[in-house]
């Protein structure tokens, strides 16, 4: 079966390396440095089978691309085409048109080209709701660990394999700080309602409004700051039409507060990889895509809602996600973490496919 994947981000590829295992993590009141929830990732390996990891996004993307294009392993390697922006989709004909007018056809089109993907219009028609400004924006920057270790004011704040999540008064801002590249680099994500042009001095200007002096000293080291507004969209009623399927931010764009945008994109790719294995007839595609939505749409939709606020997630938000959580009651932050991290997309996909194939064998045998 020939497949066109539009988009070569996390959703379009899948897997990772260059990671740091997180032994612990805390949620901290950034105004007074009081620890609100210690050991936020405590016992993750014993509970969910794997340790928590922090990874530089560039390293993750590099490894995903390597995995997708290498000749070793099952399946055919992907042929990655750059500078081939897709401007239109045809769900029924399973084809896309690039900005230079080239028309590409396949058995299946996977739209993984982000929150502004025009494929959403093809799937939903007049039902489509465009992603909009959430009022939130973020700044990101990296600082070499040596810059902190060589400064007496910050050396004591470097903690191996620790993620820290600092909150501001009233939820007005959040600062996420975690190590990557074997603790050689410190990665920062600063979230608030920023609207100013970002210069190296801007993070500190905002930090003076939001955080304690000790944290301002950390933010002062920001350089080469990247800035973007955060857009999102609520859950949508379906993710596929004919031979076109949405994954990643095209299907379920979400805010960053649960740190699940990339994780959910990888789950999408993992599920499709299993469900589309050994499909030899176009007539099988629709049933496999229905199974994909059965496994992924409620979960992706619930996490869109749960990602709308800083952790710990309030009960009102947990209740709002209940529509997409049949059989689950999220009564606490621990329940949210259990829901996020205990799900095994590989096992769920294999089990669902086995049931489908069993039914197909029974039908072919003439017993039904």
UniProtKB/Swiss-Prot annotation:
It is an enzyme of class 1 (oxidoreductase). Its EC number is 1.-.-.-. The keyword Flavoprotein applies. Keywords: FAD, Flavoprotein, Monooxygenase, Oxidoreductase, Virulence. GO terms for molecular function: FAD binding; monooxygenase activity. FAD binds at residues 11, 249, 262. Gene3D superfamilies: FAD/NAD(P)-binding domain. Belongs to the paxM FAD-dependent monooxygenase family. FAD-dependent monooxygenase; part of the gene cluster that mediates the biosynthesis of the phomopsins, a group of hexapeptide mycotoxins which infects lupins and causes lupinosis disease in livestock. The role of phomE within the phomopsins biosynthesis pathway has still to be determined. The pathway starts with the processing of the precursor phomA by several endopeptidases including kexin proteases as well as the cluster-specific S41 family peptidase phomP1 and the oligopeptidase phomG to produce 10 identical copies of the hexapeptide Tyr-Val-Ile-Pro-Ile-Asp. This is FAD-dependent monooxygenase phomE. It comes from Diaporthe leptostromiformis. The lineage of its organism: Eukaryota, Fungi, Dikarya, Ascomycota, Pezizomycotina. The gene is phomE.
């Amino acid at each position: 079966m020939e497949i066109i994947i539009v988009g070569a981000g996390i959703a379009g590829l899948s897997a990772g390396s260059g990671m740091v295992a997180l032994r612990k993590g805390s949620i901290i009141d950034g105004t007074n440095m009081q620890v609100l929830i210690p050991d936020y990732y405590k016992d993750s390996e014993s509970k969910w089978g794997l340790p928590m990891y922090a990874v530089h996004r560039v390293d993750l993307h590099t490894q995903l691309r390597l995995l997708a294009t290498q000749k070793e392993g099952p399946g055919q390697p992907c042929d990655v085409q750059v500078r081939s922006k897709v401007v239109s989709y045809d769900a029924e004909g399973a084809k896309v048109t690039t900005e230079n007018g080239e028309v590409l056809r396949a058995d299946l089109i996977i739209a993984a080209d982000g929150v502004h993907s025009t494929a959403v219009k093809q799937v939903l028609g007049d039902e489509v709701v465009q992603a909009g400004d959430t009022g939130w924006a973020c700044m990101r920057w990296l600082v070499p660990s040596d810059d902190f270790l060589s400064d007496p004011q910050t050396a004591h704040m470097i903690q191996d394999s620790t993620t820290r999540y600092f909150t501001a008064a009233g939820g007005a801002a959040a600062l996420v700080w975690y190590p990557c590249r074997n603790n050689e680099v410190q990665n920062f994500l600063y979230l608030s309602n920023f609207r100013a042009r970002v210069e190296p001095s801007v993070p500190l200007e905002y930090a003076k409004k939001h955080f304690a002096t000790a944290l301002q000293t950390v933010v002062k080291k920001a350089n080469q700051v990247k800035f973007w507004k955060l857009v999102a969209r609520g859950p949508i009623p379906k993710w596929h039409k004919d031979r076109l399927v949405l994954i990643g931010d095209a299907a379920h764009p979400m805010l960053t507060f649960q740190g699940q945008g990339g994780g959910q994109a990888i789950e999408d790719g993992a599920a499709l990889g299993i469900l589309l294995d050994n499909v030899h007839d176009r007539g099988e595609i629709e049933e496999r895509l229905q199974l994909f939505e059965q496994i992924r749409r409620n979960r992706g939709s619930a996490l869109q809602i749960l990602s709308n606020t800083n952790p710990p997630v309030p009960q009102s938000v947990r209740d709002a996600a209940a529509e997409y959580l049949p059989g689950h009651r999220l009564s606490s932050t621990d329940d949210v973490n259990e829901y996020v991290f205990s799900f095994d997309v590989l096992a769920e996909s294999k089990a669902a496919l086995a049931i489908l194939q069993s039914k197909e064998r029974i039908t072919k045998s003439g017993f039904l």
